[in-house]
């Protein structure tokens, strides 16, 4: 696995000299996925764990994932959509 751009102390992403801020929800979703260590996290689990809402039926997760992937830039592929199930963090890309 590659080096993590996630700075947990500052709650941001760091790419070289550039720092990319994360909203509290983006940070919550990303750390939930990273901490799941490759396991699938369902939309309902994200809603319950990050938003504190125990039910689905919302596009909140989809909207946030689009924003988070934009901010992840070259690491966007690290967050995989598992169709019909949820999302999985596949690891940070290897540095070249």
Predicted regions and their residues:
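Positively charged, aromatic-enriched patches within helix-turn-helix-type DNA-binding elements
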Residues: 12, 17-24, 28-64, 70-76, ...
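Minor-groove-contacting beta-hairpin "wing" of winged helix-turn-helix DNA-binding domains
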Residues: 79-90
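A structural micro-motif at secondary-structure boundaries
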Residues: 1-27, 88-96
